[in-house]
Design a protein with these regions (language model features):
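N-terminal pre-catalytic segment of deacetylase/amide-hydrolase enzymes
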Residues: 1-84, 91-97, 227-228, 233, ...
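Active-site beta->alpha N-cap acidic-glycine motif
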Residues: 38-153, 170-182
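Catalytic domains of cell-wall/extracellular-matrix polysaccharide-remodeling enzymes
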Residues: 119-124, 143-251, 255-273, 277-278, ...
Length: 283
């Protein structure tokens, strides 16, 4: 996986934004319209990345973070890093509230977006996020479990690869032709599905690695917390159950109905800082 900005001409960086060759994955949004030309980068985007220059000091490739999760013995010994992540956005209300929380705490996060939803938010909010030092990664174009995971290993590889291509086209149509992310979070998490080795290889050919999590606020659980302190306790509990690692990747959501996640985030960020964690983002 790339360890720095991807050069123009690699993985489509800097090229005209066109529709992928494969059929468009299922989506609740109207069909994607692409300009067929090079798209100017949104203000704040560092070319060849999913973040701005403010994040250069604390950005890590998805492949590195994933190795830390799968092999805790490889984690840094001399520092603690918290990767706060948000799935299923962006949304004007809840992404905006989380940006306010991050700014007040002096923290940063990685937003795993469903790219068609970027059509619903003002570009200024996305630009603000980049300038604050956050990363804008990919959480799939379709978020359709049946499309992504049904069938054989070959089917899964075909569909996940195609989904990524459409997600990238949509992202570049809004963020600019120089956008690139090496980070993909599977809907439901990679850990939840089987026979994905060929899909992993399909992503790797595109310069992409997957990333799950080892801690959570519980905001998507069927029996989710019902109070702000409960969300913080869930984060503490899940970190403890992961044997208090030096690297934590915390699952949250910034989609509709996640008001309590937004209300709980200041206390979560403050607690992480009190435990000596610095904040990183995932490229």
């Amino acid at each position: 996986m790339p360890s720095g900005p991807v050069p123009a001409g690699t993985f489509g960086v800097g090229a005209a934004v066109t529709k992928p060759a494969c059929a468009e994955p299922p989506s609740n949004y109207p069909p994607l319209k692409v300009p067929g030309t090079v798209v100017k980068d949104i203000d704040g985007l560092e070319a060849g990345t999913n973040h701005g220059t403010a994040a250069d000091k604390y950005v890590y490739p998805a492949s590195v973070v994933n190795q830390w999760l799968e092999k805790p013995a490889t984690q840094p010994k001399n520092k603690k890093i918290a990767f706060v992540t948000f799935d299923d956005g962006p949304t004007t209300k809840f992404t905006g509230e989380q940006l306010d929380n991050l700014k007040k705490a002096g923290a940063r996060a990685t937003f795993f977006m469903i790219p068609p939803q970027m059509r619903d938010v003002n570009k200024n909010m996305l630009s603000r996020s980049l300038k604050m030092g956050n990363a804008l990664a990919i959480h799939s174009y379709s978020h359709d479990y049946k499309y992504l995971y049904h069938g054989s290993a070959v089917d899964k590889a075909k569909h996940i690869g195609c989904d990524w291509d459409w997600a990238m086209a949509q992202s570049r149509a809004i963020l600019g032709s120089n956008y690139f992310s090496s980070a993909f979070r599977h809907p439901g998490g990679h850990m939840s599905w089987t026979n994905l080795s060929q899909a992993d290889a399909a992503l790797a050919k595109r310069g992409v690695g997957w990333i799950d999590w080892n801690a959570m606020s519980g905001d998507a659980d069927a029996q989710r917390p019902t109070t702000v302190p409960g969300y913080l306790q869930m984060v503490k509990k899940s970190i403890k159950e992961s044997n208090n690692p030096n690297v934590v990747v915390i699952l949250n959501h910034d989609t509709y109905g996640k008001q309590m996640t937004a209300e709980a985030m200041p206390s979560i960020l403050a607690w992480l800082k009190s435990q000596g964690y610095e904040f990183g983002v995932i490229a």
